């Protein structure tokens, strides 16, 4: 990977440290993208890291994805997930999805923009976002600290496979992980012919 673009408008908070290993106590209060850029550059100085301190919005999502080969969804909110999905379908970019909640996580590759009719998009699986009261954030619901790392590693693996054009990606499959049972489950996904996006 030669270039990473990271977009987020949040700052590092103490509550992030147990589940976000790129950040440290010394960087509390710094923009998350700046903290992540420091950590990632230390891990691999040959990869350029572009830190964009912006929230993903309808007004900027296409600009943020311009020149990007693969999009990795690390969003912690549903509006950003739907914006990324819709833009990736429109722009023909693969979206590597990952989500965590309490003791469970899931990952998939949504690539409907390049595989119209044969691959689902995020909206095929989740047509509408849940109401806010049904979707607490990590601080409210709690998340097992290592779980974002497990799901993040799966996402990184899928991104590398997409970039190199090797192996079978999770396109058309949802991989679910239950940390309490230490069990993975795979569900086949189909494109929704009624999906308004893909």
Where are these regions (language model features)?
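Adenine nucleotide-associated cytosolic modules
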Residues: 1-198
């Amino acid at each position: 990977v030669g270039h990473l673009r990271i977009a987020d408008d949040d700052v590092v908070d103490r509550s992030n440290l147990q589940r976000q290993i790129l950040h440290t106590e010394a960087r509390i209060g710094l923009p998350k993208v700046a903290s992540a850029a420091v950590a990632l550059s230390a891990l691999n100085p040959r990869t350029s890291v572009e830190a964009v301190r912006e929230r993903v919005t309808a007004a900027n999502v296409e600009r943020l994805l311009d020149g990007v080969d693969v999009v990795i969804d690390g969003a912690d909110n549903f509006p950003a997930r739907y914006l990324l999905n819709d833009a990736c379908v429109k722009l023909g970019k693969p979206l590597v999805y990952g989500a965590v909640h309490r003791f469970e996580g899931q990952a998939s590759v949504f690539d409907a923009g390049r595989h119209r009719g044969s691959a689902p998009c995020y909206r095929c699986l989740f047509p509408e976002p849940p109401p806010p009261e049904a979707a607490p954030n990590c601080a409210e619901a709690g998340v097992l600290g290592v779980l974002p790392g497990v799901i993040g590693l799966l996402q990184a693996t899928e991104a590398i496979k997409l970039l190199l054009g090797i192996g079978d990606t999770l396109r058309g499959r949802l991989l679910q992980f239950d940390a309490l049972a230490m069990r993975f489950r795979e569900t086949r996904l189909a494109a929704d012919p009624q999906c308004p996006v893909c």
